[in-house]
């Protein structure tokens, strides 16, 4: 009987201490500022990581060019020039509208060819 009372008293005491510890938790403004700074730093690191990833993706050939020999560099430069010329020619001469096509042309419509 004595041990039952002792166990109940210890259980009640532990519950009171647990509730008291939770309600008396320090609400230190320095702790709150530290947590806010750490969250801001984590967000800043994510933005920094996104920036570096975008920078790496914007120039994927740079690391390849560093490892190439001078002959390969000239070949890569020629390929880049050809790519730029193709882009310029595609932009400067857009596809002709259907009304501007020549008189004898044929269009592929559905499964048959039709004349303009």
Swiss-Prot record:
Q: List the disulfide bonds.
A: 105-116
Kindly provide the PTM information from the record: C-terminal amidation of the neuronostatin peptide is required for its biological activity, including for the regulation of mean arterial pressure.
Q: Name one GO cellular component term.
A: cytosol
Ranked from the top, the taxonomy reads:
Eukaryota, Metazoa, Chordata, Craniata, Vertebrata
Signal peptide location = 1-24
> What GO terms are given for molecular function?
hormone activity
One Pfam annotation, family name? Somatostatin
Q: Which organism is it from?
A: Canis lupus familiaris
Maturation-removed propeptide residues? 25-88
Q: Which UniProt keywords apply?
A: Amidation, Cleavage on pair of basic residues, Disulfide bond, Hormone, Secreted, Signal
TM annotation in the entry: none
Q: Name one GO biological process term.
A: regulation of cell migration
What gene name does this entry carry?
Answer: SST
Q: Which residues carry this modification: Alanine amide?
A: 43
Q: Does the keyword Secreted belong to this entry? A: yes
Which family is annotated? Belongs to the somatostatin family.
- Write the protein's name: Somatostatin
Region (Disordered) location: 62-99
Task: Report the locations given in the UniProt record.
Answer: Secreted
